[in-house]
């Protein structure tokens, strides 16, 4: 089977990673001891992708848990599914990264990285045919962003032909822990552009807005935000975990979704949006699901898709529904909104259907969009970065760990280049290339 090795780094990465394992263990009928209690062969059909079958028929997540301080790991270990993980796969330091990217990437993190790679190697060796890696982390802190990107580049060195996929939580002033988040995020994006194949941008700004506006939670907690993240992660990995044809592995997903290597930052979406612990009383129809998942308010990145154009889209419907109706609705969306899809990639919307819905819902839909509107997110970070960097505010924390100002300048311009590239393809039309030839032909006539 085609296995995926999961890594989670830093406080945020470990918290959303732990939620992810709770949700998918539940979907696959695996209890906190790793024992299967399911009721459908579909649950076990591709269980090997994320789980290793250990002695005694126990299923153990192919997960490596990393942090530079022991706190979060302890709470994962004592949490609901803490005992399902392999004890040797917890790798942690004591010093912490203090929300400093340089500590995670160059000093503290660099000291721990080899012991993490040993565990990664061991996990990779127990795979039949490893398809790739996925990392959950945030870009605003020190460990997830600094050490997370260090791990990515080290793994890339050792496994250059495997797919590298990240779930990256993008910082926002609305849900802020630290004033230096724009620095950490920009330095991280600088790495992600070069070293990952697919990055799901999970934007705290959007999560907060969804909780506040749609779910009417006046003071959203991290638990509320993480509920949305785990629903999204469960949705986008559905095709990898259950039998099906479309985007059934990370590479096929990348081939469908990434038209240019640097433009691999996806905007995830989910429908229906429900708050934690609530059940859905009315089952949604396929047209409602389709309409909701293309709605900007359902996007997990705070970008308005109507401000850009889709290069590519993948949609995953879950639950018992008519394939014919799904296809009709998806075509309907494209025909009505054709100006929001680039015309120079025909058939750029792909749809998959999985019979098993998420817990508590009869039907759900997950959206993965590669939209040029994602530039809004990078612009937002870039503006905050520039405001501080212009005055060299807080820089001494980074240069003190041996970093050079030059690296900041490079990261800044790499991110600005990324924004321009998205803009360039947003403005591109199918005709542009042909204009010159036509002129030549006219003269001949």
Swiss-Prot record:
<comment type="function">
    <text>Tubulin is the major constituent of microtubules, a cylinder consisting of laterally associated linear protofilaments composed of alpha- and beta-tubulin heterodimers. Microtubules grow by the addition of GTP-tubulin dimers to the microtubule end, where a stabilizing cap forms. Below the cap, tubulin dimers are in GDP-bound state, owing to GTPase activity of alpha-tubulin.</text>
</comment>
<keyword id="KW-1017">Isopeptide bond</keyword>
<dbReference type="InterPro" id="IPR000217">
    <property type="entry name" value="Tubulin"/>
</dbReference>
<keyword id="KW-0493">Microtubule</keyword>
<dbReference type="GO" id="GO:0003924">
    <property type="term" value="F:GTPase activity"/>
</dbReference>
<dbReference type="InterPro" id="IPR003008">
    <property type="entry name" value="Tubulin_FtsZ_GTPase"/>
</dbReference>
<dbReference type="InterPro" id="IPR017975">
    <property type="entry name" value="Tubulin_CS"/>
</dbReference>
<dbReference type="InterPro" id="IPR002453">
    <property type="entry name" value="Beta_tubulin"/>
</dbReference>
<comment type="subunit">
    <text>Dimer of alpha and beta chains. A typical microtubule is a hollow water-filled tube with an outer diameter of 25 nm and an inner diameter of 15 nM. Alpha-beta heterodimers associate head-to-tail to form protofilaments running lengthwise along the microtubule wall with the beta-tubulin subunit facing the microtubule plus end conferring a structural polarity. Microtubules usually have 13 protofilaments but different protofilament numbers can be found in some organisms and specialized cells.</text>
</comment>
<dbReference type="GO" id="GO:0005525">
    <property type="term" value="F:GTP binding"/>
</dbReference>
<dbReference type="InterPro" id="IPR036525">
    <property type="entry name" value="Tubulin/FtsZ_GTPase_sf"/>
</dbReference>
<feature type="region of interest" description="Disordered">
    <location>
        <begin position="425"/>
        <end position="445"/>
    </location>
</feature>
<dbReference type="Pfam" id="PF03953">
    <property type="entry name" value="Tubulin_C"/>
</dbReference>
<dbReference type="InterPro" id="IPR018316">
    <property type="entry name" value="Tubulin/FtsZ_2-layer-sand-dom"/>
</dbReference>
<feature type="binding site">
    <location>
        <position position="69"/>
    </location>
    <ligand>
        <name>Mg(2+)</name>
    </ligand>
</feature>
<keyword id="KW-0547">Nucleotide-binding</keyword>
<feature type="binding site">
    <location>
        <position position="143"/>
    </location>
    <ligand>
        <name>GTP</name>
    </ligand>
</feature>
<keyword id="KW-0206">Cytoskeleton</keyword>
<feature type="binding site">
    <location>
        <position position="142"/>
    </location>
    <ligand>
        <name>GTP</name>
    </ligand>
</feature>
<dbReference type="InterPro" id="IPR008280">
    <property type="entry name" value="Tub_FtsZ_C"/>
</dbReference>
<dbReference type="GO" id="GO:0005737">
    <property type="term" value="C:cytoplasm"/>
</dbReference>
<dbReference type="GO" id="GO:0005874">
    <property type="term" value="C:microtubule"/>
</dbReference>
<feature type="short sequence motif" description="MREI motif">
    <location>
        <begin position="1"/>
        <end position="4"/>
    </location>
</feature>
<dbReference type="InterPro" id="IPR023123">
    <property type="entry name" value="Tubulin_C"/>
</dbReference>
<dbReference type="GO" id="GO:0005200">
    <property type="term" value="F:structural constituent of cytoskeleton"/>
</dbReference>
<feature type="binding site">
    <location>
        <position position="204"/>
    </location>
    <ligand>
        <name>GTP</name>
    </ligand>
</feature>
<keyword id="KW-0963">Cytoplasm</keyword>
<keyword id="KW-0342">GTP-binding</keyword>
<dbReference type="GO" id="GO:0007017">
    <property type="term" value="P:microtubule-based process"/>
</dbReference>
<keyword id="KW-0479">Metal-binding</keyword>
<feature type="binding site">
    <location>
        <position position="11"/>
    </location>
    <ligand>
        <name>GTP</name>
    </ligand>
</feature>
<feature type="modified residue" description="5-glutamyl polyglutamate">
    <location>
        <position position="438"/>
    </location>
</feature>
<dbReference type="InterPro" id="IPR013838">
    <property type="entry name" value="Beta-tubulin_BS"/>
</dbReference>
<protein>
    <recommendedName>
        <fullName>Tubulin beta-1 chain</fullName>
    </recommendedName>
</protein>
<comment type="similarity">
    <text>Belongs to the tubulin family.</text>
</comment>
<keyword id="KW-0460">Magnesium</keyword>
<feature type="compositionally biased region" description="Acidic residues">
    <location>
        <begin position="429"/>
        <end position="445"/>
    </location>
</feature>
<feature type="binding site">
    <location>
        <position position="226"/>
    </location>
    <ligand>
        <name>GTP</name>
    </ligand>
</feature>
<dbReference type="GO" id="GO:0046872">
    <property type="term" value="F:metal ion binding"/>
</dbReference>
<dbReference type="InterPro" id="IPR037103">
    <property type="entry name" value="Tubulin/FtsZ-like_C"/>
</dbReference>
<feature type="binding site">
    <location>
        <position position="69"/>
    </location>
    <ligand>
        <name>GTP</name>
    </ligand>
</feature>
<feature type="binding site">
    <location>
        <position position="138"/>
    </location>
    <ligand>
        <name>GTP</name>
    </ligand>
</feature>
């Amino acid at each position: 089977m085609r296995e995926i090795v999961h890594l989670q780094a830093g406080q945020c990465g470990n918290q959303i990673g732990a939620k992810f394992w709770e949700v998918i263990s539940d979907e696959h009928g695996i209890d906190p001891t790793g024992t299967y209690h399911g009721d459908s062969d579909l649950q076990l059909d591709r269980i090997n992708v994320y789980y290793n079958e250990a002695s005694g028929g126990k299923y153990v997540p192919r997960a490596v848990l990393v942090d530079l301080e022991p706190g979060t790991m302890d709470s994962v270990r004592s949490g609901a599914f803490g005992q399902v993980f392999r004890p040797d796969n917890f790798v942690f330091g004591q010093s912490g990264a203090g929300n400093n990217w340089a500590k995670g990437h160059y000093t503290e993190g660099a000291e721990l990285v080899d012991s993490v790679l040993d565990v990664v190697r061991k996990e990779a060796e127990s795979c039949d045919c490893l398809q790739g890696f996925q990392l959950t982390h945030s870009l605003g802190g020190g460990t997830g962003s600094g050490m997370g990107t260090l791990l990515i580049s080290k793994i890339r060195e050792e496994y250059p032909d495997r797919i590298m996929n990240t779930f990256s939580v993008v910082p926002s002033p609305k849900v802020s822990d630290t004033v230096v988040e724009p620095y950490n995020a920009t330095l991280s994006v600088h790495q992600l552009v070069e070293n990952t194949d697919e990055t799901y941008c999970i934007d705290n700004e959007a999560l907060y807005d969804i909780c506040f506006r749609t779910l009417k939670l006046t003071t959203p907690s991290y638990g509320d935000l993480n509920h949305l993240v785990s629903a999204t992660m469960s949705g986008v990995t559905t095709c990898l975990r259950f039998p099906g044809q479309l985007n059934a592995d990370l590479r096929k997903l990348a081939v469908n979704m990434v038209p240019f290597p640097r433009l691999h930052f996806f905007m995830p979406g989910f429908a229906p949006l429900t708050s934690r612990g609530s059940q859905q009383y009315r089952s949604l129809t396929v047209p409602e699901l389709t309409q909701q998942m293309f709605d900007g308010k359902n996007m997990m990145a705070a970008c308005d898709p109507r401000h850009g154009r889709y290069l590519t889209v993948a949609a995953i419907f879950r639950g018992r529904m008519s394939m014919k109706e799904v296809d009709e609705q998806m075509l309907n969306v494209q025909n009505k909104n054709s100006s929001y899809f680039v015309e120079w990639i025909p058939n750029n919307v792909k749809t998959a259907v999985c019979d098993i819905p998420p817990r508590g819902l009869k039907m759900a839909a997950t959206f993965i969009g590669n939209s040029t509107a994602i530039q809004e997110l990078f612009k937002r970070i870039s503006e905050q970065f520039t405001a501080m960097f212009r005055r060299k505010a807080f820089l001494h924390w980074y240069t003190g760990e041996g970093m050079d100002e030059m690296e900041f300048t490079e990261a800044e311009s790499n991110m600005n280049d990324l924004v321009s590239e998205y803009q360039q393809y947003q403005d591109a039309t199918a005709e542009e290339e042909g204009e010159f030839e036509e002129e030549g032909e006219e003269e001949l006539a």
